[in-house]
Amino acid sequence: MRRAYRLRRPEQFRRVRQEGRTFTSPWLILTVAPARRRTLRCGFVVSRRVGGAVQRNRARRRVREAVRLLLPRLTAGYDMVFTIRTPEVIDAPFTQLQDDITALLRQACLLPAPTNETVSPVSDTPLPQHERGSQ
């Protein structure tokens, strides 16, 4: 995830926590606040109960990657903090983790509802009309 899309300073995290709304799932807590910029920025926090440094870093990397894949579809103008609550994030199937994050983002109205168009597996762009039936 590029640096422009990340929260980095403690005061940025503090502002999101103080001004934002919170959405929870069994694995994650998402806190969302309107940004002072037009971009979308994300921060990732891992609870110590997840495990040692290696486990916490692995959990952070997995969640960061799942969010990175969704970035082009997210509504800009918000700062988000994902707090990883449990060690299950480390061993969970990646698709299940993505589904959990997608549900949280939809709950926060940052991810539009899916359309019925066929989507290319390589990118999120719809396939051209002539390729739809030949899959």
Curated annotation (Swiss-Prot):
Keyword Zinc: no
Subunit structure: Consists of a catalytic RNA component (M1 or rnpB) and a protein subunit.
Coiled coil start-end: none
Single biological process term from Gene Ontology: tRNA 5'-leader removal
Family: Belongs to the RnpA family.
GO molecular function term, any single one: tRNA binding
Organism: Chloroflexus aurantiacus (strain ATCC 29366 / DSM 635 / J-10-fl)
Keyword terms: Endonuclease, Hydrolase, Nuclease, RNA-binding, tRNA processing
Gene from which this protein is expressed: rnpA
Catalytic activity field: Endonucleolytic cleavage of RNA, removing 5'-extranucleotides from tRNA precursor
NCBIfam families (UniProt xref): rnpA
Pfam families assigned: Ribonuclease_P
UniProt entry tagged with the keyword Metal-binding: no
GO cellular-component term (any): ribonuclease P complex
Protein name per the record: Ribonuclease P protein component
Ranges for region Disordered: 115-135
Enzyme Commission number(s) of this protein: 3.1.26.5
Function in brief: RNaseP catalyzes the removal of the 5'-leader sequence from pre-tRNA to produce the mature 5'-terminus. It can also cleave other RNA substrates such as 4.5S RNA. The protein component plays an auxiliary but essential role in vivo by binding to the 5'-leader sequence and broadening the substrate specificity of the ribozyme.
